[in-house]
Amino acid sequence: MKRFSCFFIWIFVLTSILPAQEREVKLKVVQTSDIHGNYYPYDFIRRREATGSLARVHALVQKEREAYGKNLILLDNGDILQGQPTAYYYNYIDTVAPHLAAEMMNFMGYNAGNMGNHDVETGRTVFDRWAGDCRFPILGANIVDTATGETHFETL
C-alpha cells in the first residue's frame, strides 16, 4: 500500500510539473438586455406582429449553439420584468405559476443574469419569485438588503 501511495504521488508530481498543452478554445458570448417583457414577437398594445422578442433571440441562440456547443455563454443584463402586458400578467395576476420570463430563460439555457433598474421597480416579491424560478445564478453585488447590509443575490 505504501509503494502504491508513493507511486501515485510520484505520478501526480510528474504530471503537475509537465508543461500544459497549448490549444485554442473559441468562446461565444451572447448577451441580452432590456427585453422589457417582449417575450413574444407580438405587440399586445397595438395588436400586431413586433420585430423583436426573446423568442426571436432564441432562434439566434440555437444557431450559435450549433456552431459553438457548450462554448456559448448566454447572459442577461436585466430589465426583463416590465414593459408588455404578458410581463405584468406574470408579475401581478398569475403569481402561482412559474414566471414566464424565468421559464423562457431556463429553456434557452442562460448561464447567468442580473437585475436591471426596471426589474427592481417591480418590487421584491416579483423579482424574488422570478429569481427563484431561474435555474441559473442571478448576480447582483450592488443589490443590498438595507435591513441586514448583506447582498441580496450571489456575488463572485
Mark where each language-model region is.
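Bacterial Sec-dependent N-terminal signal peptides
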Residues: 1-23
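Acidic, metal/ion-coordinating pockets
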Residues: 20-156
